[in-house]
UniProtKB/Swiss-Prot annotation:
Organism: Methanococcus maripaludis (strain C6 / ATCC BAA-1332)
Family assignment from sequence similarity: Belongs to the UPF0248 family.
Full protein name: UPF0248 protein MmarC6_0667
Domain of life: Archaea
Family annotation (HAMAP family): UPF0248 (MF_01245)
Any Pfam family: MJ1316
Length: 76
């Protein structure tokens, strides 16, 4: 489900990847959380890649629309 949502936001013509950010668990960062713009990620198998950073799907905390603050995904 999460992978499908990310693919939809990246590739569906009705969405602009620049409008979304992914918040993920990163131990040692402030509040153990970092954010990455959706437009900067690449999906491969069960990981997201951002520069040299590998982000497993289970570490994704939220996907947020920057324009209106809507949370499209929130980890339970």
């Amino acid at each position: 489900m999460l992978k499908e949502l990310i693919n939809k936001l990246l590739w569906h013509p009705g969405y602009n990847p620049e409008d979304y950010v992914i918040k993920y668990l990163h131990r040692g960062a402030e509040n153990d959380e970092k954010s990455v713009p959706l437009q900067n990620i690449v999906i491969e198998d069960s990981f997201l890649f951002f520069d040299e950073t590998h982000i497993p799907f289970h570490r994704i905390l939220e996907i947020v629309n920057l324009k209106n603050g809507e949370i499209l995904y929130k980890k339970r």
